[in-house]
Amino acid sequence: MIYKKNFSKLSPITNLIRSALLNCRGMYITLRYMFKPKVTLNYPLEKGPLSTRFRGEHALRKYKNGEERCIACKLCEAICPAQAITIEAQERDDGSRRTVRYDIDMTKCIYCGFCQEACPVDAIVEGPNFEYATETREELMYNKSKLLHNGQIWEEAIDLRIKKNSQFY
């Protein structure tokens, strides 16, 4: 059984001293945090640091010579637990395969990163971009050209992230 002290039975002087001490304690805590550096960021104007392992917007990469990396092995499509990736491939004259259609439904994607880990040529990656809000759901259906465009925009950042995290893949 928990006993509560009944402060109403204390003398007025004791209550006054107790209240003053509690006020001083509260002011001490307030003053202690007042002079510490702020932890709140003013988001649209200030952005916090991102981990190099952050999983954001998807991108398809190209080689330095301009040829797309994707070899249409469809491992990313097979491993995707949300079944958000759709690939159609076509064989080239030289016998290699390339994608004709590469779609990702970003409304289904759970950003697990399995597609990135399964890809043998680092073609599909999740980049550092997290600001891709849209007004309609249709804009979140990424096709091959949108994914290649993302790869062009974020190539330097993606390359740096892959180099830093190569030991984990």
UniProtKB/Swiss-Prot annotation:
Its EC number is 7.1.1.-. Keywords: 4Fe-4S, Cell inner membrane, Cell membrane, Iron, Iron-sulfur, Membrane, Metal-binding, NAD, Quinone, Repeat, Translocase, Ubiquinone. NDH-1 is composed of 14 different subunits. Subunits NuoA, H, J, K, L, M, N constitute the membrane sector of the complex. The lineage of its organism: Bacteria, Pseudomonadati, Pseudomonadota, Alphaproteobacteria, Rickettsiales. It is a peripheral membrane protein. Its cofactor is [4Fe-4S] cluster. This is NADH-quinone oxidoreductase subunit I. NDH-1 shuttles electrons from NADH, via FMN and iron-sulfur (Fe-S) centers, to quinones in the respiratory chain. The immediate electron acceptor for the enzyme in this species is believed to be ubiquinone. Couples the redox reaction to proton translocation (for every two electrons transferred, four hydrogen ions are translocated across the cytoplasmic membrane), and thus conserves the redox energy in a proton gradient. GO terms for cellular component: plasma membrane. Gene3D superfamilies: 3.30.70.3270. Residues 61-90, 100-129 form the 4Fe-4S ferredoxin-type domain. One of its GO terms (molecular function) is 4 iron, 4 sulfur cluster binding. [4Fe-4S] cluster 1 binds at C70, C73, C76, C119. Belongs to the complex I 23 kDa subunit family. Binds 2 [4Fe-4S] clusters per subunit. It comes from the Bacteria. The keyword 4Fe-4S applies. It is found in: Cell inner membrane. [4Fe-4S] cluster 2 binds at C80, C109, C112, C115. It catalyses: a quinone + NADH + 5 H(+)(in) = a quinol + NAD(+) + 4 H(+)(out). GO terms for biological process: aerobic respiration. InterPro entries: 4Fe4S_Fe-S-bd (IPR017896), 4Fe4S_Fe_S_CS (IPR017900), NADH_quinone_OxRdtase_chainI (IPR010226).
